[in-house]
Regions:
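Glycoside hydrolase catalytic-domain context in secreted enzymes
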Residues: 1-671, 690-691
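Short beta-strand elements
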Residues: 674-691
Length: 691
C-alpha cells in the first residue's frame, strides 16, 4: 500500500508522502486555485474557490440565510453553529452531485472562503455587511461557532472554513489594490487580530485568506509579521491569497518588479495556494534562484493536507449526503428563524405590533418593497423560493394591500421616457387610501459591496455618505406629509440615517430568502423583534475620521469620543416587551444577574455584559452575551461566564497583561451609556471587582 493511502498516519504524513511522489513541476501545479488531477493517487482536479458567507453561493439553488451582518444582529452563538452546519452540508451534497457528473469547476468545491471576520470600523465600507460588525469579541464568538458548524466534529471535515481577510482590511474599496494600512501595535492586538486568533486557536479554522492591501508596508499575502502570528497561534491549515492579490505586488503595490519575484515573495512567506495566476511563474522563480524546491514542497504538503482532511483520498461519512438535502424544508426553516432573530426594532411609538382587527387596508410602498435583491445581499446563492416584504404582508393580511414602487432605488425615474419623480403621486395616493403604510427603503448590493462587483458608479462599492439616495428621501417626506401612520422598513447592511423615523422603524438588513415572511410576523406580532445592532448607526459621515485612517481613535462604540454623532448605538434594539436587570453578583468568573420580563407578553432579548477599567479601552468592551427568553412577568437568574481575557489590557507595544486594579462589569439589554439607556428605556446594573 502506498504510504499516502495509510489512514493510520496523520494528514500531514500522508500529504508529505503524496507530495514526494510528484515532480517539482507537479507540486507547483497543485498550488493554483484550479489544481489539476493527480491521477496516480486517484485525486481528481480541484477548484479551491467556493463561497459560503450566508449560504453556498454562486453554485445554483441553495438555502439563503440573512447576510452576515444580519446574522450578527441575532447575537446567537448556537444559531451560528447551526447555520454553518447547514451551509457545509449543502456544500458537501452539491460537491457529491457535481463530482458524480464530472463537474469539478469553480464554486463546486469543499473549501468555503468564509467567514469574513474583518472589523467593520467605518460605516462607509461597502463590504461591511459581509462581516459580523465592529466588535472583536462579538466577531470572535460568532466566527468560532460558524467555523465549528462548517467543519463539523467528525473524522473528516464536512467542509473547510476560511478566515478572511487577514488581518487589517476594511476599505476604501477603490484603493485596496495599492493601499497601505498603517496600524499601531496596540490597535492590531486590541482590535484587528483577536477574531483571527480565536478562529485559529479555538475554531481550528482550516484556511486563512490574505487581503489585497499592505499592512505597515508589507503585502498581506506575504507579511512576515502577520504570518508569524499564525505560526505563534499554532495554525496548521492552508493559507490562500485573495484573488489576484499576488499580482498586485508588482502591478500596483510596486514592491516587486516581476511576476516571478511576486510569486517567490508570497511562497516564501507562507502563502500555499494562489487564487489567481501568479503562481504560474513559480518554476521561473525557482530557475532564478528566488525560491527552493523545499519551498514548493512545503506549500504542496499544506494544500494536500487540507484535501486529505476533507476525505478526498478516502471513502468517508459524507459521500452519501444526497442532493435532496439542498434547500430542504428544515434548512429553510432555519433561514426564517435567523431572519426573525436578526431584525432590529429601532423606534416604535406604540403602533407595533399591528392589530389586524383594527385595520382594513395597508399600503406597501418603496423600491425595496418587492425587491428580491434587497433580501439577498452579496455572495449569495439562489433560493428556490423567496418572499419579498410585499409578498410577506400580502400572505399574512386578509385585507386590501395597495402597492406602489414610489421611486427607483437611486435613479430619479423608473422609466427612461418618464419625467423625474414619475411614481411619487401614485405612492401618495396609496398612502392616503390605506389605514397604515409600510414603506420599504434602503440599499442593496448594487449600492454597497465589493469593488468591481457592484453597480455603484459613485464609490467603487463604498458609500459616499450615510444618507438614503435622494429619491428615497423625497419619497419619505411626501409620505410623511400625508399625516397617515407610517412604518419604515430599512433594508441595508450598514449604518444608514433615514432622517425620518415615522411611527416605527425596523432595520431588516438583507434578511435572506424568507425576509418578507419574517417581517410580516414581526409587524403583526406573531414574533417579537429581538435583534441588536452589531454596529453603531451614525447621524452623519462628516464627523467620522478619514476613511483611510486605520487608527481606532474615535471609531466604534469602544473608542468614540462622545455620542453626539450616534443615532443608534451598538447593542441597541427594542422588543414588544421590556426586560429589566435586578440583583447582580460576581464569583469565580461567573456573573449572576436577575432578569425580569416586566412587559405584557413573552419575548426574547439579548443580555449584554460590558467591562470597563482605567487601563482598558477608552469606553468599555463587550465581554459576554446571551439570548434570554422569558414569559411576561417571569424572573430568572442568568449565570454568564466572563472569560479571563476580558480582564486583559493591551499596552502601546501590543502586549497583553492583567493589571491589578478595579474593574466594573455592566449587565443590561443595551450599552451602559446615557443614550443607550434612554433609547432602550432601562438601565444597566453593575458590580465592581478588584484584581
Amino acid at each position: 500500500m502506498e504510504k499516502y493511502k495509510d489512514k493510520q498516519l496523520s494528514a500531514y504524513e500522508r500529504a508529505a508522502a503524496l507530495a514526494d511522489t510528484l515532480s517539482t513541476e507537479e507540486q507547483a501545479q497543485q498550488l493554483k486555485y484550479d489544481a489539476p488531477a493527480i491521477e496516480k493517487a486517484g485525486l481528481p482536479s480541484y477548484n479551491w474557490w467556493n463561497e459560503g458567507l450566508h449560504g453556498v453561493a454562486r453554485a445554483g439553488t441553495a438555502t439563503v440565510f440573512p447576510q452576515a451582518i444580519a446574522l450578527a444582529a441575532a447575537f446567537d452563538k448556537d444559531m451560528m453553529y447551526r447555520v454553518g452546519e447547514v451551509i457545509s452540508t449543502e456544500a458537501r451534497a452539491m460537491y457529491n452531485s457535481a463530482a458524480k457528473h464530472g463537474d469539478t469547476d469553480i464554486y463546486k468545491g469543499l473549501t468555503l472562503w468564509a467567514p469574513n471576520i474583518n472589523i467593520f470600523r467605518d460605516p462607509r465600507w461597502g463590504r461591511g455587511h459581509e462581516t459580523y460588525g465592529e466588535d472583536p469579541y462579538l466577531t470572535s464568538r460568532l466566527g468560532v461557532n460558524f467555523v465549528k458548524g462548517i467543519q463539523g466534529e467528525e473524522e473528516y471535515l464536512r467542509a473547510a472554513a476560511c478566515a478572511k481577510h487577514f488581518a487589517v482590511h476594511s476599505g476604501p474599496e477603490s484603493l485596496r489594490h495599492e493601499f497601505d494600512a498603517r496600524v499601531s501595535e496596540k490597535d492590531m492586538e486590541e482590535t484587528y487580530l483577536p477574531a483571527f486568533k480565536a478562529l485559529v486557536k479555538e475554531g481550528r479554522v482550516e484556511g486563512v485568506m490574505g487581503a489585497y492591501n499592505r499592512v505597515n508596508g508589507e503585502p498581506s499575502c506575504a507579511s512576515e509579521k502577520l504570518m508569524g502570528k499564525l505560526r505563534e497561534w499554532g495554525f496548521d491549515g492552508y493559507f490562500v491569497s485573495d484573488c489576484w492579490a499576488i499580482r498586485d505586488f508588482h502591478t500596483t503595490h510596486k514592491i516587486t518588479d516581476t511576476a516571478p519575484q511576486s510569486a517567490a515573495m508570497a511562497l516564501k512567506a507562507g502563502c500555499d495556494v494562489n487564487c489567481g495566476n501568479t503562481y504560474l511563474h513559480i518554476l521561473a522563480a525557482l530557475e532564478e534562484g528566488l525560491i527552493t524546491k523545499q519551498d514548493i514542497r512545503t506549500a504542496c504538503i499544506h494544500a494536500l493536507r487540507t484535501r486529505i482532511r476533507l476525505g478526498q483520498l478516502d471513502d468517508n461519512e459524507f459521500d452519501d449526503l444526497p442532493f435532496d438535502i439542498i434547500a430542504c424544508d428544515g434548512n429553510k426553516a432555519l433561514s426564517l428563524e435567523a431572519a426573525e432573530k436578526s431584525m432590529v426594532l429601532l423606534h416604535n411609538d406604540g403602533i407595533l405590533p399591528l392589530d389586524k382587527s383594527r385595520i382594513s387596508s395597508i399600503a406597501v410602498i418603496g423600491p425595496n418593497a418587492d425587491s428580491r435583491a434587497a433580501l439577498l445581499g452579496n455572495y449569495n446563492g439562489t433560493p428556490d423560493r423567496s418572499v419579498t416584504f410585499l409578498e410577506g404582508i400580502q400572505d399574512a393580511f386578509d385585507g386590501r394591500v395597495y402597492y406602489a414602487e414610489g421611486c427607483q432605488l437611486f435613479r430619479d425615474r423608473t422609466q427612461g421616457l418618464a419625467l423625474p419623480g414619475d411614481r411619487y403621486a401614485e405612492a401618495v395616493a396609496a398612502c392616503e387610501a390605506a389605514d397604515v403604510t409600510v414603506v420599504c427603503v434602503g440599499l442593496d448590493a448594487t449600492l454597497e459591496g465589493e469593488e468591481g462587483d457592484t453597480g455603484n458608479e459613485f464609490a467603487s462599492g463604498d458609500k459616499p455618505d450615510l444618507r438614503l439616495p435622494e429619491v428615497q428621501r423625497v419619497l419619505l417626506q411626501k409620505l410623511k406629509g400625508t399625516g397617515k401612520p407610517l412604518i419604515i422598513v430599512l433594508a441595508a447592511g450598514s449604518s444608514v440615517n433615514t432622517e425620518c423615523e415615522g411611527n416605527a422603524l425596523i432595520n431588516a438588513w438583507y434578511p435572506g430568502q424568507y425576509g418578507g415572511k419574517a417581517l410580516a410576523e414581526i409587524l403583526f406580532g406573531e414574533v417579537s423583534p429581538s435583534g441588536k445592532l452589531p454596529v453603531t448607526f451614525y447621524k452623519s459621515a462628516d464627523m467620522l475620521p478619514d476613511f483611510t485612517d486605520y487608527s481606532m481613535k474615535n471609531r466604534t462604540y469602544r473608542f468614540c469620543d462622545d455620542e453626539s454623532n450616534v443615532l443608534y448605538p451598538f447593542g441597541y434594539g427594542l422588543t414588544y416587551s421590556h426586560f429589566e436587570c435586578g440583583d447582580v453578583s460576581y464569583k469565580d468568573n461567573t456573573l449572576a444577574v436577575n432578569v425580569t420580563n416586566t412587559g405584557s407578553r413573552s419575548a426574547e432579548d439579548v443580555l449584554q455584559v460590558y467591562i470597563k477599567s482605567e487601563n482598558g479601552v477608552k469606553n468599555h468592551s463587550l465581554c459576554a452575551f446571551e439570548r434570554v427568553s422569558l414569559f411576561d412577568g417571569e424572573s430568572r437568574t442568568i449565570s454568564i461566564n466572563i472569560p479571563e481575557g476580558a480582564f486583559e489590557t493591551v499596552d502601546d507595544n501590543g502586549v497583553r497583561a492583567v493589571i491589578s486594579g478595579r474593574y466594573t462589569l455592566y449587565a443590561g439589554f443595551t450599552q451602559p451609556t446615557e443614550l443607550s439607556e434612554k433609547l432602550y428605556g432601562g438601565r444597566c446594573v453593575s458590580v465592581e471587582i478588584s484584581i
